[in-house]
């Protein structure tokens, strides 16, 4: 062995330790043969080393076998490196052997996937557990599933949801649906901690009890519903029967009410006649007693007819008739038996009208209104000479019917009759009135005459309406388009100037600018044509201008202004020039201002002053 000089500096690669670093050891397990050769090729083969130094042991560049690298890992015991390769997914098995991978042994510490899988199962079971407010049927169902099966949770999931739903619905029908708030509040924390124990205890305690309670509770509402249905059916039948009986008795009641009103009106007429014509007491008493007895008998009949349907009806139907029936019953009860006990007719006259005042006030009040509205022919006095005595008797019931409709209280009519029946009643009245008073035909003939007289006026109005649109507006030219203006110019006799108007877009509103000063700008330079076109436009627009003796006229100026222009020059002529001489020389007498009124005023002033002076002299 050759000695190494003292000046020799060993490289960092030479002092490599045999123990591999942890960072590089991970690569050795999965390394290929090519990579191992590259690592060994970095060492210098020519250097001599001491056999005594462990750090100077040479690493031979020869290729090593795959089996030789395994005991290095066993001697040095690097469990962390093997743990990194094993940590794959959760539910995966041990790593499979490949041609390039080294064989490794699994330590007991590599059971971490089983721990994680157990944790995941627990979390899945906690999530799949029912909430705190689950029904008892669901708790019982899941309990039975857990007791039957020993496999994990994922396998024991029900594959037929329809069966599960049917079971849950059948069990839910047999058990009460709601819990008390106290039980739910106490059971929630227990379910989160020990769900299995809670489910077993609750099912054992509450299976027998709630079934009996629920059957009793379910029978109660069924019995109540059957009772309600049995009660409602006879009520409906009774209501229908009462309605039919009321409809049958309604026309009879109306007839009785009309009879009452007839009697009351006859009494009022007789009383008015008696007040006008006094009669002896002997004649008055029996007639009054007869009328009172008639009243009492009729009212007693009304009482019987009105009370019988009221007994049959239910309280619900009685409320629909409202107040008018109650008023009639009260009046009949008060006045039904009293007239027979009282003998004196004077006392009867005072006592009987008191309860019937409310019912008789309304029919008696509208009499003056009816007398105003009805024609003179409706009155009995006017109908006597025109018609025989037989028709006068028929006139009274028609009038009474009208008074009953107008004067009777609206509440009673609405409660006793429908709209359809009232309409039929009104139609009957109209037919009766037409039979009694055929003068209505005369009014129809008058309306026909009026229509015939109106016809010529309508014809005149139609003729006026037709003539108005034919009139042309005064300023129709304002709506003309440039093409229409060009046609108008060609009609005047200047078709060569059409393009001048169309190119300059001169419509009807711009015709006011068509004059001798603007026509040359449009391209019309002939002086005679300019004069003719400007003249026709003035006529069309209604502009009046004086005819000038020459075509181009000087601008209008004031006479005084023109005079001062001449007077402003220096010289003998300008100095001696006066306004009157200038006006005469220029021929501007027509443009002189009117001074006649001012001259008269100036002349009147001295006259007034002379008169005032004379008055002053006389006063002095």
UniProtKB/Swiss-Prot annotation:
Residues 261-270, 609-620 have a biased composition (Acidic residues). Residues 1-394, 594-620 are annotated as: Disordered. Residues 233-242 have a biased composition (Basic residues). Pfam families: SAM_1. Residues 480-543 form the SAM domain. Residues 62-83, 106-125, 135-180, 271-286, 295-315, 323-337, 347-382, 594-604 have a biased composition (Basic and acidic residues). Gene3D superfamilies: Transcription Factor, Ets-1 (1.10.150.50). PROSITE patterns: SAM_DOMAIN. It comes from the Eukaryota. InterPro entries: SAM, SAM/pointed_sf. SUPFAM superfamilies: SAM/Pointed domain. Residues 181-191 have a biased composition (Polar residues). PANTHER family: STERILE ALPHA MOTIF DOMAIN-CONTAINING PROTEIN 15. This is Sterile alpha motif domain-containing protein 15. It comes from Mus musculus (Mouse).
């Amino acid at each position: 062995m050759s000695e190494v000089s003292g000046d020799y500096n060993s490289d960092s690669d030479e002092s490599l330790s045999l123990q591999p670093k942890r960072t590089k050891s991970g690569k050795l397990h999965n390394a290929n043969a090519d990579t191992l050769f590259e690592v060994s090729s970095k060492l210098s083969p020519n250097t001599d080393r001491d056999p005594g130094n462990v750090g100077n042991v040479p690493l031979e560049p020869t290729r090593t076998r795959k089996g030789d690298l395994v005991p290095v890992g066993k001697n040095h015991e690097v469990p962390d490196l093997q743990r990194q390769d094993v940590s794959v997914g959760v539910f995966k098995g041990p790593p499979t052997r490949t041609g390039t991978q080294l064989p490794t042994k699994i330590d007991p510490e590599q059971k971490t996937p089983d721990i994680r899988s157990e944790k995941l199962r627990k979390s899945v079971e906690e999530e799949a557990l029912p909430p705190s407010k689950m029904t008892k049927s669901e708790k019982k169902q899941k309990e039975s599933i857990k007791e039957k099966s020993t496999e994990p949770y994922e396998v024991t999931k029900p594959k037929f949801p329809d069966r599960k739903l049917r079971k849950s619905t059948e069990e839910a029908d047999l058990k009460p649906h709601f819990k008390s708030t106290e039980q739910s509040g106490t059971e929630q924390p227990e379910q989160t901690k020990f769900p299995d124990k809670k489910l077993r205890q609750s099912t054992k305690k509450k299976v027998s009890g709630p079934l009996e309670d629920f059957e009793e509770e379910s029978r109660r509402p069924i019995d109540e519903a059957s009772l309600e249905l049995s009660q409602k059916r006879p009520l409906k039948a009774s209501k229908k029967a009462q309605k039919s009986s009321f409809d049958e008795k309604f026309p009879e009641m109306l007839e009785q009410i009309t009879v009452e009103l007839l009697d009351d009106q006859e009494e009022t007429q007789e009383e008015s006649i008696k007040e006008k014509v006094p009669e002896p007491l002997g004649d008055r008493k029996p007639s009054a007693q007869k009328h009172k007895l008639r009243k009492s008998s009729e009212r007693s009949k009304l009482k019987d007819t009105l009370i019988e349907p009221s007994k049959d009806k239910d309280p619900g139907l009685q409320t629909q008739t409202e107040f008018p029936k109650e008023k009639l019953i009260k009046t009949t009860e008060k006045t039904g038996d009293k007239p027979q006990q009282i003998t004196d007719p004077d006392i009867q006259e005072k006592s009987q009208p008191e309860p019937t005042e409310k019912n008789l006030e309304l029919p008696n009040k509208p009499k003056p209104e009816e007398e105003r509205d009805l024609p003179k022919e409706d009155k009995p006095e006017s109908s006597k000479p025109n018609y025989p005595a037989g028709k006068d008797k028929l006139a009274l019931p028609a009038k009474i019917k009208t008074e009953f409709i107008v004067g009777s209280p609206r509440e009673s009519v609405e409660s006793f009759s429908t709209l359809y029946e009232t309409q039929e009643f009104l139609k009957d009245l109209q037919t009766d009135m037409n039979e009694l008073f055929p003068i209505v035909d005369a009014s129809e003939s008058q309306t026909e005459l009026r229509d015939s007289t109106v016809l010529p006026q309508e014809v005149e109005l139609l003729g006026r309406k037709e003539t108005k649109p034919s009139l042309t507006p005064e300023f129709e030219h304002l709506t003309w388009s440039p093409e229409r203006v060009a046609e108008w110019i060609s009609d005047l006799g200047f078709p060569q100037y059409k393009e001048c108007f169309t190119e300059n877009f001169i419509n009807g509103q711009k015709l006011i600018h068509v004059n001798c000063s603007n026509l040359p700008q449009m391209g019309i330079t002939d002086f005679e044509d300019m004069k003719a076109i400007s003249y026709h436009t003035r006529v069309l627009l209604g502009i009046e201008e004086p005819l000038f003796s020459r075509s181009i006229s000087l601008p209008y100026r004031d006479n005084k202004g023109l005079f001062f222009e001449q007077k402003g020059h220096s010289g003998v002529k300008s100095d001696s020039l006066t306004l009157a001489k200038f006006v005469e020389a220029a021929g501007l007498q027509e443009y002189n201002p009117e001074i006649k009124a001012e001259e008269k005023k100036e002349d009147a002033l001295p006259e007034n002053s002379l008169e005032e002076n004379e008055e002053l002299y006389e006063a002095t």
